[in-house]
Amino acid sequence: MIQPQTYLNVADNSGARELMCIRIIGASNRRYAHIGDVIVAVIKEAIPNTPLERSEVIRAVIVRTCKELKRNNGTIIRYDDNAAVVIDQEGNPKGTRVFGAIPRELRQLNFTKIVSLAPEVL
């Protein structure tokens, strides 16, 4: 469960390393975001000499959370960190690689480009 002021790791090579959630895209007063939700975030830590800079406001999709994800068949998936992938306004990832495991629920949410870049889909 991601809420405003939550820090997230970046799971791609876009140039950002750490994000802080500002807002959850969707309903006007949504409290928490889960895997597959789009958030507005600010870059708190960035790699030098990359297109993304610190304090830049961007959009990102959440790909991993510490809070469990329950599936319809009864399985539960839990990750070790909270992570997101930086996206543009159309929903395409800004980076060319995605690091770490990605849940298959992102495919149903039309983030197929992120799923195709991922090394492992759970």
UniProtKB/Swiss-Prot annotation:
One function term, GO molecular function aspect: rRNA binding
Record-linked SMART domains: Ribosomal_L14 (SM01374)
Record key words, sorted: Chloroplast, Plastid, Ribonucleoprotein, Ribosomal protein, RNA-binding, rRNA-binding
Claim: Ribonucleoprotein is one of the keywords in the record: yes
One biological process term in Gene Ontology: translation
SUPFAM superfamilies per UniProt: Ribosomal protein L14
PROSITE patterns reported for this sequence: RIBOSOMAL_L14
Subcellular location: Plastid, Chloroplast
Pfam short name (any one): Ribosomal_L14
Entry GO CC: chloroplast; chloroplast stroma; chloroplast thylakoid; large ribosomal subunit
InterPro entries: Ribosomal_uL14, Ribosomal_uL14_bac-type, Ribosomal_uL14_CS, Ribosomal_uL14_sf
Sequence similarity: Belongs to the universal ribosomal protein uL14 family.
Subunit structure: Part of the 50S ribosomal subunit.
Role of this protein: Binds to 23S rRNA.
Protein name per Swiss-Prot or TrEMBL: Large ribosomal subunit protein uL14c
Gene: rpl14
